Regions:
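Conserved short alpha-helical segments that host acidic/polar catalytic motifs at enzyme active sites
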Residues: 1-159
């Protein structure tokens, strides 16, 4: 089962995210990753197959992971193999997300939103990111309106 953590606040996000993911290891997983809002005003992704300890080593290698906002995820594969590309978080355009569950209509959404050829992974989660990004662009970058339409598009159990 996937584990999810998010943080925004005055402390350094990377340590909070990594410690939170380490606390979720008992749930079982095959890969882990984080996304954080960097000092350069960009969202950065770091993800890997394997243990949270391997993710911590990758984070240490980054030149600047200081951030006060981020999300983290441990994945238990339901769609696609155990690869770095399939690890969360996923990004499509301006949307970066993590997700737990199964989106049953992800094949239909891939076709409906013309995502074929734009996906880097084999996951329903990246399809969800692509759909939300498309809606965000269509709805004049209104996040609330985009999310309202987004949840109406998805079929399945997810969080």
């Amino acid at each position: 089962m996937c584990g999810i953590i998010g943080y925004t606040g005055p402390l350094e996000a990377d340590n909070i995210l990594l410690n939170g993911l380490a606390g979720l290891e008992y749930r079982g997983y095959d890969s882990a990753g984080i996304a954080y809002f960097g000092n350069d005003s960009k969202i950065h992704l770091i993800k890997t197959v394997g243990k949270v300890a391997a993710l911590k080593e990758l984070v240490k290698q980054e030149s600047d992971c200081s951030s006060h906002c981020g999300i983290g995820h441990t994945r238990w594969a339901t769609h696609g193999g155990v690869t770095t590309e399939n690890a969360h978080p996923h990004r499509q355009g301006l949307v970066t997300l993590i997700h737990n569950g199964i989106i049953e209509n992800y094949h239909q959404l891939t076709e409906e939103y013309d995502l074929e050829g734009h996906l880097l992974s084999q996951t329903d989660s990246e399809v969800a990111a692509g759909v939300l990004n498309a809606l965000y662009e269509r709805m004049d970058h209104d996040p609330l309106l985009s999310i309202r339409h987004f949840v109406k598009e998805l079929k399945g159990s997810y969080g």
